Design a protein with these regions (language model features):
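The substrate-binding groove and active-site-proximal loops of carbohydrate-active enzymes
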Residues: 21-33, 54-72, 117-129
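Aromatic-lined substrate-binding rim segments of carbohydrate-active enzymes
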Residues: 11, 37-116
Length: 129
């Protein structure tokens, strides 16, 4: 009797990507666009196949309450797919923009005594806002 590999016992997440999903967070909005091509080359060299994109990008996607910018994200996704990389689009809620904290202070995190934590920390939101 042959023992089946554990990997063979579970269905693939995506049959077009039948490999271990090695990768991590990729935050290109924090770097000049001129570095993105080099990033793709480094991903290729390190067998980095899957990038989580957008975790801290809220302010880059929505620089003002009434303004959205997706051009940079479109460019990054195009570069990733052209370089034969996969991506997971994250919700950009880990770092809310300053305009939101100023316009809606109730979204700021509160400590156990109800004091609001000022803007500038990661994951600075209040779940009950």
């Amino acid at each position: 009797m042959t023992q089946q590999s554990k990997l063979q016992q579970y269905p693939l997440i995506n049959p077009q990507a039948p490999f271990i999903w090695h990768g991590g967070d990729y935050n290109p909005e924090q770097w000049p666009p001129a570095t993105w091509d080099e990033d793709m080359a480094l991903m290729q060299q390190s067998y980095f196949k899957v990038a989580t994109v957008g975790v801290f990008s809220w302010v880059s996607l929505q620089p003002a309450e009434d303004r959205f910018t997706f051009d940079w994200l479109d460019s990054v996704i195009e570069k990733l797919t052209t370089a034969d990389r996969y991506f997971v689009l994250a919700t950009p809620s880990a770092a809310q923009p300053a305009w939101m904290s100023q316009a809606y202070p109730d979204v700021l995190r509160a400590d156990d005594r109800g004091r609001r934590v000022h803007h500038g920390n990661r994951t600075n939101y209040c779940p009950n806002s």
